[in-house]
């Protein structure tokens, strides 16, 4: 079974990094409503577009998702 996107994302946290994946990880860490148990692209993508309490350049999300799928 695949690890949830959030669980994988937390392994990418690095407050000193300017990499988009590290930025998203730090933002998601502070967001108590982030869908922590999901591994579904549509659920995560829709959340980031419509419900996230933070602003993130979604142009980077597809590449981050590909990294998640390939881990």
Swiss-Prot record:
Pfam family for this entry, one: YozE_SAM_like
Can you tell me which family this protein belongs to?
A: Belongs to the UPF0346 family.
Question: What is this protein's record name?
Answer: UPF0346 protein SUB0487
Say which species the protein is native to.
Streptococcus uberis (strain ATCC BAA-854 / 0140J)
